[in-house]
Amino acid sequence: PKKQGKSELAAAVALLLTCGDGEERAEVYGCAADRQQASIVFNVAADMVRMCPALSKRVKILDSQKRLIYQPTGSIYQVLSADVGNKHGFNTHGVVFDELHTQPNRKLFDVMTKGSGDARMQPLYFLITTAGNDTKSICYEIHQKAKDIIEGRKIDHTFYPVIYGAEESDDWTDPKVWKKANPSLGITVGIDKVKDACESAKQNPGEENAFRQLRLNQWVKQAVRWMPMDKWDKCEFAVSEDDL
C-alpha cells in the first residue's frame, strides 16, 4: 500500500546495483508510466547520496538529466522517458520499476526485462507497486504469478515475490487487516489516518474501492464503487409477472 517505504527501498536497491555490485559500467534504469513518476525513486536515491559522505565523493548527480554516475566503475542509474518502450539496445544490469499498475500496456516492461540483461552476470529487476483495477494488465499478470509462487502452484527460482495486502474475504474495516496490509502502520503511517479514511469510506461508498486499493493493496474491479456489493445483493427478491 501507499507510504510503506517502497520508494526508499527501491532507491537503496538502485544504489546497490549502481555502486556496490562490482559490475563495471553497470546500467541501472528507473522506469514508470512517465518520467515524473520514475523520478520519485531517483530523487530519494540522490538524497541518499548527498547524505552519505562516502557516496557523495564517488557519485556525480546530474539532476537535470535524472542520472547518477558512479565514477569508480563508470556505472549509471538513469531515469528513462515514457517513450522508451519503442527503443532497444539496453545492456541492463538493473531495473527499478515503480507503480507497475499504472503501465498502459506491457511494451515497456517487455523491453526492459526480456533479454536486456542477458549479457550481465546477475541482472536484477525490482518491481514495486500498489494494486490496480485492471485485471488484464501486465501488473495483474505479475501479481497473479507472485501469488501462484507464494501458494505453491508455480515454481520460479528467479522470481522472489513479496505481497502485503488484504485478502478478498478479509473485513476491510478491521484494524487487524490494516496491520496485515501495512507493515509500517504506526511508523510511517499513523493508524488514526487509516481509521479516518476507513470511516470516510463507510459514509461514502464511492470511496470504498480507493480505500481497499490504496490502503489495503486489494485489486478492485473499478476505481469507484457506487454501491457496496453486499448491499446490492440484499436488493435481490422474487418478482412476479403480474407485478411487472
Ranges and model annotations:
Residues 1-244:
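Phosphate/NTP-binding elements of NTP-utilizing enzymes
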